[in-house]
Regions:
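Extracytoplasmic
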Residues: 132-134, 154-156, 174-176
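A domain-level signal for the mature, folded cores of soluble proteins
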Residues: 23-148, 166, 181-268
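Surface-exposed flexible segments
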Residues: 171-185
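Bacterial Sec-dependent N-terminal signal peptides
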Residues: 1-29
Length: 268
């Protein structure tokens, strides 16, 4: 009977131990014995934000124009821009076969290297172009309030290489390829030769993943979550005297709206 009592005590202690482990905060041990498993974007995002912790979220589509003074560190130096971000992305895809590229933003249509090269080098009339003529980099990100960390986060999802209409024989802009942002970060953090160039102090140049995570670029908002999935430019009235300028101003107003949201969040 005494031995039976000892067995009962051991069983109770073991059960209590597992129960205590099960109640450990999932933020401390998210993959342990927790009673909840949190969904998380591990395909596109470089940030570990649990879906259940997204208290507020809106998607934003932006464009970086590498010709702008603030973005010259990404554009590269010299006339051919061989040390710029566009050429380094090309090398990562073609020379190293390290970045998977897609034809659509749903990432359902992978591109072969040959298809990527054709999209990259040939304009609509079949003429070859130069790397420096590719100066648009678009990307999609989510503006998220992470309630677990009480933090507002810009969570980039993918990058889109775009051929400008002028480069594309004035036949309209062309999507060259889509790249997962997580793949982009994982590649360039291990390739320090590809750098955001600090022209004032070369020793403080950064890898592309550091530059993007530090938001060392200037971009304009082209689209945000809306019922019609319309670009900001498409929402400008047709009778506007200067629709391009109005679209730019509307994008800027949206930027200020995000800043105001962040400011108001902590006001109370």
């Amino acid at each position: 009977m005494k031995r039976f009592g000892q067995y009962v005590c051991i069983v109770l202690l073991v059960a209590f131990g597992f129960g205590a482990e099960a109640q450990v905060a999932t933020s401390v041990n998210p993959s342990g014995f927790g009673d909840r498993q949190f969904a998380m974007d591990t395909v596109f995002s470089n940030k570990r934000i649990r879906e259940d912790d997204k208290m507020y979220q809106i998607s934003v589509w932006r464009r970086i124009d590498l010709r702008e003074k603030y973005n010259l560190s990404l554009y590269g130096s010299g006339d051919n821009k061989a040390n710029g971000i566009v050429n380094h992305i090309y090398k990562a895809v073609v020379d190293d076969n390290a970045l998977e590229v897609f034809a659509d933003q749903n990432f359902t249509k992978p591109l072969s290297i040959a298809e990527f090269q054709e999209n990259f080098w040939l304009s609509a009339n079949g003429d070859s172009i130069f790397v420096k003529q590719l100066y648009y980099i678009d990307f999609k990100e989510d503006f998220v309030f992470d309630r677990h960390h009480s933090d507002l986060v810009f969570d980039i999802k993918f990058i889109e290489l775009v051929m400008p209409s002028v480069t594309n024989a004035n036949a309209g802009q062309k999507t060259i390829a889509y790249i997962r942002y997580k793949d982009f970060v994982n590649y360039f953090k291990n390739h320090p030769e590809a750098r955001w160039l600090n022209f004032q102090n070369i020793s403080k140049s950064l890898t592309y993943d550091q530059a993007f995570e530090s938001r060392l670029f200037r971009s304009v908002v082209r689209r945000f979550t809306n019922p019609d999935e319309a670009l900001i430019a498409d929402m400008v009235r047709a009778d506007n005297a200067n629709p391009e300028m109005q679209a730019y101003l509307n994008g800027l107003a949206f930027e200020y709206k995000l800043l105001e949201f962040e400011n108001a969040l902590w006001e109370w």
